[in-house]
Amino acid sequence: MSNDSTKKSFRPQQDETLQKGKKRSVDRYIVSRLLTYIKPYKTLVASAIAITIAGSFLGPLRPYLTKVAIDDYIVHGNLKGLTIISMLLAGAILLDGIKQYITTWMTQIIGQKAVYDIRMDIFRHLQKLPARFYDRNPIGRLITRTTSDVESLNEMLSSGIITILGDLLQLFFIVVLMAWIDWQLTLIVLSILPVMIYATILFKNRVRIAFQDVLTHLARLNTFFQEHLTGMSIVQLFNREEREAVKYAAINADHRDANIRTVFYFSIYYPLIETLSSAAAGLVIWYSAVRLLKADLSIGVVVSFVQYIWLFFRPLQHLSDRFNVIQTAIASSDRIIRLLDEHEGIEDPSGKQQIETFRETIEFKNVWFAYESENWILKDISFTINRGEKIAIVGATGSGKTTLINILSRLYPFAKGSVTIDGIELPGIAEHSVRKLIGVVMQDVFLFSGTIRENLAFGNPDVSDEELREAARIVGADRFIDELPGGYQYRVLENGTGLSSGQKQLIAFVRALLYNPEILVLDEATSSVDTETESLIDAATSRLMSERTSIIIAHRLSTVQKADRILVLHKGVTRESGNHQELLAKRGLYYKLYLLQHPEQGILTGALSSIPGRE
């Protein structure tokens, strides 16, 4: 049976600045997706909007009250009326402050909850993506998605949209009140708007691309930094510090230059807004002075309009600031949504068969596999594993040994052929169901930051302390664990730093034992341990494998001699099959591999064959 999923190539997440000058439909799609994260908190959103609408007239009301105070009470010496209007003004200021406090608190709660949901969706989605996706996408880039990109959304979701609504309503009330007070001065103020709108549209197109460039180079910066921190020992051993610093400087310079471009646009835009607002104020003052000289205008109107000018341009300034935030957020959202929309290779569990146990056989039949199209790693592989059987797979590096396990564990789909478990096609079985049956001990053991106990119980978090200690005793890990500060509560550093390779390998064996799989896979599991540790593991693995179907992948042939059957792979092809003695008797590839690792056996065999009468 052919698995068509491999016919589609897994593309890396595009990190370049794509689709420059995106269409509005794309922006609408992004906004609609973001709104789905706000929808669960619609009560909070509705309350924040209602309070924003209700309080949006309080700011514009203050200059009007000032105008009334001057023209109706100060000019006429009406102290009682002035006291009342002053109290109203103080009340408006107080209510405006309360409104701002409540809306700020509500919008921050909305934003934080939405950002939490986005991060959780990204993490769950990343857990579903297949191994091929991670082969082609740098970890640093993905980290940028879940940190910098998500954080860029925080301010927009926290205050951006609702603040914009409040600013627009304030502008509306300001224009209405200005027109009510004096329509001629209002037209002078509004005459600046066309220039401002044109500048904003022009600015939007350029700053959008600039922000995409910044995020692109930030992802590259994070990727390079993460890779080199992980491989710092290699950099130092090969004396590559200066050369790698030069590479980093180039990437860092790209990020710096991208930021400078955004700063350049803002350094033009913000002074332009300030200049326009000052020009409007100057025109209003000049025209007001002309009318005052003609006794065609009151002092209260002039004072209120000077206040209105700054109030009018303050929401516009806020809108431009929010526009900055939104441009950053839209660029980040585009990248996040493209990641969340990456569904290639994700299994749809509906219709997949669940299997609770392994009863009879695993069969590979004419299986072909390639990590890259047509670059075949496995070629027409066929073999069967019976329940309770101990199978060893040996061969040179790159022969496809680990690939077979990756296929069986459903980490990678095969291209052609058929793989079945108890007669059921592997692609038709749910991934979770297959992996529940298989426990894998890898050559490179990964330990998570946390306690020894948490790492041991990773596959079975409900295990009791007694069961955990017994498993450690069986494997022989209890001795070194008890000697650690804190024992089973010893804090493991990132990826097990501070523990030896042998200690990490023992932890992996305990973890597999506690997982209690029906099929045990040992993938070069003892290749990085010393002789003493290997002797501890040998006793434990014999006990582990006695009641389980076992697959042993090994480069060192000394670890596979007790296997029921040994498969010998060479360049993706099954060359030989049989037990240890049968394969030695054939004097084929296995025999040659054995002599390479045990040259003394070849000397002994040659000496015996030279004795007369011995063949």
Identify what each model region corresponds to.
Residues 40, 44-57, 88-89, 159-213, ...:
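Transmembrane helices of ABC transporter permease
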Residues 126, 248, 336, 364-366:
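Conserved catalytic Walker-motif region of ABC-type ATPase nucleotide-binding domains
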Residues 122, 126, 235, 336, ...:
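Helix-loop junctions and hydrophobic alpha-helical segments within the transmembrane domains
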Residues 348-349, 355-615:
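ABC-type nucleotide-binding domain
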Residues 240, 264, 279-281, 311-339:
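Cytosolic ends of transmembrane helices, especially the final helix of ABC transmembrane type-1 domains
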Residues 140, 213-261, 351-353:
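Loop segments that connect adjacent transmembrane helices in multi-pass transporters
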Residues 1-59, 74-88, 103-107, 111, ...:
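Membrane-integrated ABC transporters
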